[in-house]
Amino acid sequence: MYTPNDSMREEISLKVFVNHDWSKLCPDILRSILESLSSTDFHRAKTVCSDWYSNWKTCVKPLCPWRIMYVKDSLMLFKPGEDKIYKGTNVGLSNDSYYMASSGNWLLMVDSHLGFYIFNLLTSKRIDLPSMESSIRGGKVRFEQNHEHGFNWGHFVEPSRKVTVSKITITRESRAVLWIDERTGDFVVAWIFNYRYLFSYKKGDDSWWNWNNHWNMESLNLSFLDLAYRNSKLYIYITKSHIKVVDFSGNDPIEVIDKNPYWEHPFRYLTKKGEYINKRRIAIQKSGDVLIILSVLAQRSKEKVLFYIFKMNLASKIWERVESIGDDEMLIFGHGVTIRAPVQDVGDGIKSGSICFVSDVWPPYYSPAATNWGVFDLATSIIKWSKKDSFNNRYVQTYLFFPGFA
């Protein structure tokens, strides 16, 4: 049956035929084409040329997160819109790989040999990082792999001790960040293990860096808690609520000392009666400002789950609670940077001023919903939970991935 959509397609086809140049399509026509594409093709389209990329940035399309899930230790990928479940092995990921972080269309993964690699979900391109068994710069630590199949992957070995590395310690006691420039291919990876070790790698380095001895963390009784990366700087949140900053813009990473306003002014928050802070994370806005985000369980008249966001007033050097993060920015809890978002809700509650999260932000005993991810509106403190499906329940370990954005 002939429909108005058929007429529109014919009109578009005619204009394209007359134009003969896909890069010079009328912006309105190009935008309508881009917004009609599947999630995967939508993000591939921005790489066609600079004109397409410029138009792509103006599109209003729902930010539907893909879900990376582990079902009985098998890696699965769910693409919204297509309503399909893919096995990790079908897209190029092995079952013994574990998600660590994401950036753009890329995932940072680690396997059971503690082998790190970054993987583009749209192109299946894979970049292997140097082996952790090779020489590590900056600290007296090395990794010894367990070559027998078993629970333990190996050990980090120092002169006075050995620390076990296993699936549990990697998935539960590690934090990681990935940044990649999709056009130049430059990238930076950093990760925390066991709150004790911080490693980093920048494209072009001949080995990993270890920062433990550089800062003498253990003698100062300090631990690494979280990290974020933006604008060539790595921000590290440590115990006692201090924040260190490392500049990666040069050949070698250098700690920023004089121009780091956060070190001498640690974050402080006194909980109110009935408040329980479960997790603390940092994130960097596009302006470069640092945010500290708390996931809070408030036990007052009835239990309520909340998020609090704090930002330093750079004039007074006082951390202040904020109710907004900008007109076109939103957060994925634990991701480390804000991402571009539509001002109005275009689906699932995801819009500017919202926080997308998975349910492990709350204590293990507290299960506020049957599903495993939701969206928190900062303005109203209301949570919109995702729709329940066969894989969307609190017993499935889930990570959220926004291709092209985070």
Curated annotation (Swiss-Prot):
Q: Which cysteines are joined by disulfide bonds?
A: none
Q: Any idea where the F-box domain is? A: 20-67
Q: Which domain of life does the UniProt lineage start with?
A: Eukaryota
InterPro entries per the UniProt record, alphabetical: F-box_BR-signaling, F-box_dom, KIB1-4_b-propeller
Pfam families hit by this protein: Beta-prop_KIB1-4, F-box
Q: What name does UniProt use for this protein?
A: Putative F-box protein At5g38270
The protein's organism comes out as: Arabidopsis thaliana
